[in-house]
Amino acid sequence: MDLGIKGRRAVVCASSKGLGRGCAEALAAAGCDLVLNARGAEALEQTAADIRAKYGVNVEAVAADITTEEGRAEVLKAAGEVDILVNNAGGPPPGMWSDWERDDFIKALDANMLAPIAMIKALVPAMMDRGWGRVVNITSQSVKAPIGVLGLSNSARAGLTGYVAGTS
């Protein structure tokens, strides 16, 4: 199936494994050049090498923590003109509501809501100016049907979903 995105440039966050890697591979198979991001350099570089070898597209790997301004700046500097943004983040871990402290919520919000919003705000204006762009936010079915032990994830991912619904 031709998605009509060959030659486009995509940023894929948390792309060294799991859903992020799957998204990166699907975009590469469709002919997109990629900027991959994850915190772990070794796994990220291996993913980038695997995708380059298999799909023959340009792949840049940026090992950085996207939840920090510095990490986002590194990714955005490498990214240049972006057509597609895939926001993705792992975690936060399951647990009991009675065990979560404010810092647990802040970490969950940073990774699963605030960093994606910052990436959207950084990249979407240029997409709008060019008249073309796509944003994919990997969240969870728990934004519609919360899961008890995933309260940190439920709240942060639902916040991102609400933000996007309010801006689209």
For each predicted feature, which ranges?
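Conserved glycine-rich Rossmann-like NAD(P)H-binding loop of the short-chain dehydrogenase/reductase
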Residues: 32-46
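Substrate-binding pocket helix/loop in short-chain dehydrogenase/reductase
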Residues: 96-98, 104-109
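A short, exposed helix-loop element centered on a Lys and neighboring polar residues
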Residues: 120-121, 165
